[in-house]
Structures are given as C-alpha cells and as structure tokens.
UniProtKB/Swiss-Prot annotation:
Motif NPA 1, residue range(s) on this chain: 70-72
Domain of life: Bacteria
InterPro entries the record matches: Aquaporin-like, Aquaporin_transptr, Aquaporin_Z, MIP, MIP_CS
Biological role: Channel that permits osmotically driven movement of water in both directions. It is involved in the osmoregulation and in the maintenance of cell turgor during volume expansion in rapidly growing cells. It mediates rapid entry or exit of water in response to abrupt changes in osmolarity.
Keywords associated with the record: Cell inner membrane, Cell membrane, Membrane, Repeat, Transmembrane, Transmembrane helix, Transport
Catalyses which reaction(s): H2O(in) = H2O(out)
Record has Repeat as a keyword: yes
Name of the protein this chain belongs to: Aquaporin Z
GO CC terms, sorted: plasma membrane
Domain notes for this protein: Aquaporins contain two tandem repeats each containing three membrane-spanning domains and a pore-forming loop with the signature motif Asn-Pro-Ala (NPA).
Positions of the record's site feature: Selectivity filter: F50, H182, T191, R197
Entry GO MF terms: water channel activity
Annotated transmembrane regions: 8-28, 41-61, 89-109, 138-158, 168-188, 211-231
Amino acid sequence: MKKYIAEFIGTFWLVLGGCGSAVFAAFIAAPGGGNTNEFGLGYLGVALAFGLTVFTGAYALGHISGGHFNPAVSFGLWMGKRFPGSQLAPYIGAQVLGAIVASLFIFIVAQGGPNFSLDGSNPLATNGFGDHSPQGYGFLAALLIEFVLTFIFLIVILGVTDKTAPAGFAPAAIGLALTLIHLISIPITNTSVNPARSTGVALFCGNPALIGQLWLFWLAPIAGALLAGFVYHNVLEDLGRPEPEAE
C-alpha cells in the first residue's frame, strides 16, 4: 500500500507543480493590464516546473515506489523487465487518481482568480492537437512528438537507473530530460508524455473535444514507452556491462 500512496502523492505533485505553474503563473500581465508577460514564467518556467516536480518527487518517494508518477513509465519499465506486470493496474490507478485530485485542486483554486476562464485552446493546461494545440499543430505532429519524446524519456530513465550507471544522479537526469521534453513540445501538444497528467486536467476543462482527444495521449506515450523498454532491454542493456575477459 505504501507504494501506491507514494505514486498517488508523486503524481499529485507532478500535476500540481507542472500544470499549476502553467495555469497560475505562465502568464502574468504587467500592472495596468496589457498583453506583456512581465512577471509570468512563460514556456521556460513551466518546463522547469515539470522537471523540478519529477526531480524532487523522485528523491523524496523513489525509494518507496520507484518514482514512476506516469503510466507510460510503468509500462516502459515493465517492458524493460524492471517492473512486475502484476503491479501495473494498481500503480496506474494510483497515478490517475493523483492526477485527478491535483487537477480538481487546480480547478478550485483557479476559480478564485479575477480572470478565471476555461476559454482558449488549452484551459487548465490540457493537451491537444489541431484547434487544441497551442500553436495549431495537427494530429500527425502530435502523434509523432508524443511517441518519440516518450521513447527518449524512457531510454533516459532506463539508462540512468541501470545497475551500471553512476549512483545518485537518476532524479536529476530524469528531471532535466523532462524539462527539455517540455521545451521541445509545449508549442505542439502542450506536452503530455504522461497519460495520467493529460486525463486529470481534461476532466475539468469543460470541453468535450479535449476529452475526445485523450486517446492519443494514452496511445502515443505508452507505445513509445513500450518500444523504449524493448529496445533498451534487448539492444542497449548489455552495452553497459563489462566485456567478459578472453580465456
């Protein structure tokens, strides 16, 4: 049970820190109004926020549950022979529940703001494509970027948590990787690579079209993660092992 609670808390923190920074602090208009983002975090700040949540969450909770906080990560680790299949359902359940509770919290707090609105392409930091992409990217672009970036994310995770990797640096490397992933793809899909994160905020955005696009943010990240797990275990894993000495 401790593992599931840790996954719930870690995913709650990821969504609150990442999506919360996007909702509350990405854009803060200059005094007197206008469109200048004088005090807001912008894309860079939001990307750093997502990375920092994983960085801190993994250090705090990774020793309890492994610090997945993401169904795609759980699937990728399972395919890479690092995680038992019997634990997939309870882990994913805890992750999705944590994301939903965090999204509800963001929704409640956001309503207290003077400019609260669910208008726009990505209310509550939702993920989407087409009309719901921050910069209007279409379906194929969204599918490819989510697949490829989740693949890379899992390669990083599997690599830095390998038994032969330097100890103690995994949370930092994973957090920095997630930051870079957001810098690349916020304009395209608002960056998912995490089905739980996408699901939580979509449930409270008030737009059925965004819920209708959720399938892509489950399919592409999980497919990318599964391929990464397969490739790392079957192709890359032995590359880090010492070569046996010739007799």
